[in-house]
Amino acid sequence: MINTGRSRNSVLLAHRFLSTGGFWRGGTNGTMSRTINNVNPFKLKFIPKTVPAAADSVSPDSQRPGKKPFKFIVSNQSKSSKASKSPKWSSYAFPSRETIKSHEEAIKKQNKAIDEQIAAAVSKNDCSCTEPPKKRKRKLRPRKALITLSPKAIKHLRALLAQPEPKLIRVSARNRGCSGLTYDLQYITEPGKFDEVVEQDGVKIVIDSKALFSIIGSEMDWIDDKLASKFVFKNPNSKGTCGCGESFMV
């Protein structure tokens, strides 16, 4: 008995073999695998039916145990045909002449403004270099008096100067006494080379230059009582005196 179904399948396979231009070789379990020279004219895709339709549920084939419906989709698109598709060309338009011209004019204006700023800065620097530097005005501060005389001291000094042989009083400071310094008064006729002459109300007094830092700003007074007649000093620079008041320290 001749199996017509199997012979019909072999005829179909032979037609496909001739149409594709490939060759077939035997596979396992009576199947045949097809090999083509880098050409794949069709593909078989296996898609199982997850949810059966209403008509399939009624059919007797679906009710048989152990059998599941299959679905094959044949796609004739190959990799070479997909790769042969050319991509779309991107469109590009060149700028017009007016746009290019306006851009060049804007660049020229910008460069011109930069050149003007540089020239102005250079000219300003040149002018500042040529002008002589201005000298700062010196503020005049009142000079502190080296020594001041009380009215009694002025009266006594005038009496000394009214003598036939006028005498000047020279004030200095010597290292003496308990505290370190003591006032030293001398009668002189002429001031020394480095002495300072102070004049107040027409009365002159000479101060030793070495004693300036010790007695600057002091006030000179004259005391005449039953115990003594002498000149005394009120010195703001004094930090302390001895018990007898003869010496002081600064």
From Swiss-Prot:
InterPro entries (alphabetical): Fe-S_cluster_asmbl/transfer, FeS_biogenesis, FeS_cluster_insertion, FeS_cluster_insertion_CS, HesB-like_dom_sf
Subcellular compartments: Mitochondrion matrix
Sequence positions that bind Fe cation: 178, 242, 244
Range of residues in the leader sequence: none
- Where does this protein have compositionally biased stretches of type Low complexity? 75-89
Ranges where the record places region Disordered: 54-89
* GO CC aspect terms: cytoplasm; mitochondrial matrix; mitochondrion
Give a GO biological-process term. biotin biosynthetic process
Family statement drawn from the similarity comment of this UniProt entry: Belongs to the HesB/IscA family.
Q: What does this protein do?
A: Involved in the assembly of mitochondrial and cytoplasmic iron-sulfur proteins. Probably involved in the binding of an intermediate of Fe/S cluster assembly.
Protein name as annotated: Iron-sulfur assembly protein 1
Tell me the name of the encoding gene: ISA1
